[in-house]
UniProtKB/Swiss-Prot annotation:
It comes from Streptococcus pneumoniae (strain ATCC BAA-255 / R6). Interacts with MltG and MreC in the elongasome. Interacts with KhpB (also called EloR/Jag). This is Cytoskeleton protein RodZ. Disruption phenotype: Cells are smaller. Deletion suppresses activating mutations in khpB (also called eloR/jag). No change in subcellular location of KhpB. Cytoskeletal protein that is involved in cell-shape control through regulation of the length of the long axis. Probably part of the elongasome which synthesizes peripheral peptidoglycan.
Length: 276
């Protein structure tokens, strides 16, 4: 049974998700939007989102995921109006049951191909093991003098990369990262009066800013403008703000910084400097 009613954006999104048979957790995996932000959109609480720019982006992703016309949703958001929605009466408990039943069927049907794959992999492993064992058994032993020469050569050769590795390690130790979630701290040892910070993206859009620099007012990085640089003094710490963390790279004096500990949607980085 269907009926045409005016609904808020959040109500339309929620009903479309239910009609698609998606839970919020499944929708989060599909859109890569945090769960609390999905809940805020369904509650029409758009003030909880980072900015109107990200609100529009999240609404567009949500609409695509549940097969809605994203332009209608965005127009309603921009004008603050409601949406005329063809509502289908749906029993949410019934949909949940269907989803569980569907998942059980998928698990049952997918078990057999997995069994055959494991069996095939074991067959290959047994064959390779037998071949290697048979090859080793048929090889004649080398004279002891020849063995000694090979060991000597290997030992002298391997000493070269060791010194290179030590040198590389001393360079990397100049930068250390601590913290996690939406805030990390970077400690950088340097004898310079100023350092160069570079922020770059490949295929995402993110607003970034660097305090105490020419980027203090912020700039938006995107596939059209992929990077921005700032020169900062080392006499005091600086704060880097990221509107979107995922997909943003940071280098300090051309040294790449590991930002994997920043796991939130948005984040802040505090950079402190100590004399080397």
């Amino acid at each position: 049974m269907t009926s045409m009613r005016k609904k808020t954006i959040g109500e339309v999104l929620r009903l479309a998700r239910i009609n698609q048979g998606l839970s919020l957790d499944e929708l989060q995996k599909k859109t890569e939007i945090q769960l609390d932000m999905l809940e805020a959109m369904e509650a029409d609480d758009f003030d909880q989102l980072p900015s109107p720019f990200y609100t529009r982006s999240f609404l567009k992703k949500y609409a695509w995921a549940v097969e809605l016309d994203d332009q209608i949703v965005l127009d309603a958001y921009d004008s603050g109006s409601m949406i005329t929605y063809e509502e289908v009466d749906v029993d949410e408990d019934e949909l949940t049951g269907r989803r569980r039943s569907s998942k059980k069927k998928k698990k049952k049907t997918s078990f057999l191909p997995l069994f055959y794959f494991i069996l095939f992999a074991l067959s290959i492993l047994i064959f390779v093991t037998y071949y290697v064992w048979n090859y080793i058994q048929t090889q004649p032993e080398e004279p002891s003098l020849s063995n000694y020469s090979v060991v000597q050569s290997t030992s002298s050769t391997s000493s070269v990369p060791h010194s290179s590795s030590s040198s590389s390690s001393s360079i990397e130790s100049a930068i250390s990262v601590s913290g996690e979630g939406n805030h990390v701290e970077i400690a950088y040892k340097t004898s310079k009066e100023t350092v160069k910070l570079q922020l770059a993206v490949s295929d995402v859009t993110s607003w970034v800013s660097v305090s105490e620099s020419e980027l203090e007012g912020g700039v938006t990085l995107s596939p059209k403008k992929k990077s921005a640089e700032a020169t900062v003094a080392t006499k005091s710490p600086v704060t880097i703000t990221l509107g979107v963390v995922k997909g943003v790279d940071l280098t300090v004096d051309n040294q790449t910084v590991d930002l994997s500990k920043l796991t939130a949607q948005t984040g802040q980085i505090t950079v402190t400097f100590t004399k080397n």
